[in-house]
A protein has these predicted regions:
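Short amphipathic beta-strand starts and helix->beta connectors
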Residues: 1, 29-35, 70-72
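Short amphipathic alpha-helix segments
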Residues: 15-36
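Polyanion-binding surface elements
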Residues: 79-106
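Major-groove DNA-recognition helix of helix-turn-helix-type DNA-binding domains
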Residues: 96-126
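A short, Lys/Arg-enriched interface patch at domain edges and termini
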Residues: 130-191
């Protein structure tokens, strides 16, 4: 085992593999996914890896190549741990508390400028980008392990690209959609918010 290598745990959510596909496990094993466990959540296939590699990026990319080489109809929909996290999950990953996360979010603790939530589930559960939260934590001296930030950014990029490909037909069908969206000012506002967040991080880093 190389000194630079470690075991990385991650999971692929798959489409195109059904519980009755008896040959799927053997095909994945022969394609180099012998460090993965295939299971099902209902009819959704989950492929969990414990892969030895120098980095999470190297581990995930080699696993993606393995799934492709298996010759199945499998499509990787998402890589977990997902970028979307609740306050409880942020607390778990940081060793903080839900109350502490709430105080960061509301600006009552820390330097402020905590990333805005990306979505909500129901009336009370907010969801954030872990990549944005990890970057904020690192920039403000609350997270010492730079690998956590790098891994969070990598997973966010991977899932963004998978989603872009998955939903490409929604915008491809209407070539003027992006232009119409641009005219609302929403994209410009998002670029402004991103730029401001980057400046805030640079200023406190």
């Amino acid at each position: 085992m190389s000194k630079t290598e470690k075991t990385h745990n991650f999971l692929f959510v798959l489409d195109g593999v059904a519980p009755e596909d008896d040959g799927a496990e053997d095909a994945l094993f022969e394609a180099g996914c012998d460090d993965a466990l295939l299971s099902f959540r209902g009819t959704t296939a989950l492929l969990e890896f414990d892969r030895l590699a120098a980095s999470l990026e190297e581990a995930v990319l080699s696993a993606l190549r393995g799934v492709e080489a298996a010759g199945l109809d499998a499509v990787v929909l998402r890589v977990e741990p997902d970028d979307l996290v609740s306050a409880s999950e942020i607390a778990r990953r940081t060793g903080s508390s839900r109350e502490g996360v709430r105080l960061w979010h509301e600006g009552e603790r820390g330097p402020g400028s905590f990333p805005p939530p990306l979505a909500s589930v129901g009336a009370n559960t907010l969801l954030w980008s872990w990549a944005e939260v990890a970057n904020w934590l690192s920039a403000n001296g609350k997270l010492d392990d730079e690998a956590v930030v790098e891994n969070a950014r990598f997973l966010a990029r991977v899932n963004a690209l998978l989603n872009e490909e998955r939903y490409h037909h929604l915008t491809k069908a209407d070539s003027s959609f992006r232009d119409r969206l641009k005219k609302t000012g929403a994209l410009r506002r998002l670029r402004s918010l991103r730029s401001r967040s980057q400046k805030d991080s640079a200023g406190t880093g």
